[in-house]
Regions:
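Extended catalytic-interface subdomain
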Residues: 117-165
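Generic structural signal for well-ordered alpha-helices
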Residues: 31-38, 94
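A solvent-exposed, charged loop/short amphipathic helix patch at secondary-structure junctions
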Residues: 1-25
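Two-component system phosphotransfer/interaction surface
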Residues: 85-98
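Conserved, mostly hydrophobic/aromatic
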Residues: 79
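Conserved small/polar residues in nucleotide/adenosyl-binding loops
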Residues: 167-172
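Short beta-strand/loop segments at the ligand-binding rim of alpha/beta enzyme cores
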Residues: 41-48
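Short, glycine/polar-rich helix-capping loops at beta-to-alpha or helix-loop-helix junctions
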Residues: 50, 58-72
Length: 175
């Protein structure tokens, strides 16, 4: 996110690297590091968060590649994404995992995104169906509709669960 200027020129300084040196971190660092962790530790739980994950938690327009990309949880092959500040959700996740709960059951936490192929356990009154990834990549109107629904559901006190199908036959629940 911090590597390029608005005109897509590479920055020589990196405020988030020790000493401010540029060119120390890869582009799309969350994706790269998650994939490396998955390769080194195939059975480990991969949790992602921070500014990059928060901004890309749902399907989004990617300025660098000039296209709509899937949620970063898909590209990073992560198990759970925590968005926003995350100070509360990280404690809840740590306590749940420490108690022996499998990460696939951490679907009840506010401020998280998880992948699933089954939304049957969700109460229809508790979620909003976003246009599918397929729809938003082919229709600007559907992209705008999805963005509006996301925007109207950012307040964690009143927001509903946002469900987005990657394709019409493959469900992903973005919370």
């Amino acid at each position: 996110v911090n590597h390029y200027t608005v005109s897509k020129k590479r920055r020589h300084k990196d405020s988030y690297t020790s000493g401010g040196e540029g060119f120390k971190r890869p582009d799309r660092a969350v994706i790269v590091y998650s994939q490396m962790a998955r390769q080194a530790f195939p059975d480990a739980n991969i949790l992602i968060g921070g500014i990059e994950a928060s901004l890309r938690r749902l399907a989004h327009y990617d300025y660098w590649s000039d296209k709509v990309r899937k949620s970063i949880i898909i590209d990073a092959n992560a198990d759970l994404l925590m968005f926003g500040m995350g100070e509360n959700s990280i404690i809840e996740v740590a306590e749940a995992l420490d108690s022996g709960l499998d990460i696939k059951y951490l679907t009840y936490l506010d401020g998280t995104v998880y992948k699933t192929k089954n939304i049957d356990d969700l109460n229809e009154a508790d979620y909003i169906m976003l246009p599918s990834y397929e729809e938003i990549t082919t229709s600007k109107r559907k992209y705008a509709e999805s963005f509006q629904k996301q925007y109207l559901n950012t307040d964690h006190y009143n927001a509903k669960i946002l469900v987005c199908l990657l394709y019409t036959s493959d469900a992903a629940d973005d919370r």
